[in-house]
Amino acid sequence: MRKYLVIGNPIGHSLSPLIHNHWMKKYHLSDSVYEKRKIEEKDLKNIIEEIRKDEVVGVNVTVPFKKLIIPFLDQLDFSAEETQSVNTLFKVDNKIVGYNTDRAGFGDTIREAYPRSNDPIILRPLEGIRIFIIGAGGVTSSIISALKSEGADNIILSNRTKEKANELKKLFPELEVLDWGKRPPICNIVINTTSIGLT
């Protein structure tokens, strides 16, 4: 049996098994199963060992482990390296590689709302648009990276714990950090990355 997992804590809310098992059944992948597993930080090393031993084929990673998993990996792809956030991992040439698909997924959504054009004036559709991000969780660096790739140059971030916001500012120096509870200037786009989005 080819086993795939989504790991996190909490994990009860995850619809990933429902979605993935539906498609596995539809495409007659009867030798595959996708499960969710609630883990603690101490379990991360064991997850990697399960992949090394081919007990698990691939793993999706959700809160709070997107950054915590990195030290256990052999390699990161470009987007995971840039964002310092991993949400997918599997074995490639006997190495456990971490990927970040959040960046591409959010980028696709942004491009639908703000399409690029052949017109050089709107080649970077988010240039000059003020964006306010609430929260500095595991997906935030992926969102900032996707926004920047579409020309965003005016991103404001606010988080309850300023240390986490400042960590992101180290990755993205042009980011403006606003103290929690302060009102931002009028923004064109507001993005919530707090844990309230899990409910």
Question: Would you name each region that the model predicts?
Answer:
Residues 171-199:
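Rossmann-like adenosine-cofactor binding region
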Residues 61-68, 137-139, 195-198:
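Short glycine-rich anion-binding loops that position phosphate/pyrophosphate groups of nucleotides
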Residues 2-114:
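Phosphate/diphosphate ligand-binding glycine-rich loop within oxidoreductases
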Residues 115-130, 186:
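Intrinsic disorder/low-complexity segments
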Residues 3, 33, 130, 153-155:
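Residues at the starts of beta-strands that form the adenosine-phosphate
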Residues 8, 95-103, 110, 114, ...:
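Glycine-rich adenosine-cofactor-binding loop
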Residues 150-172:
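NAD(P)-binding Rossmann-fold cofactor-contacting core
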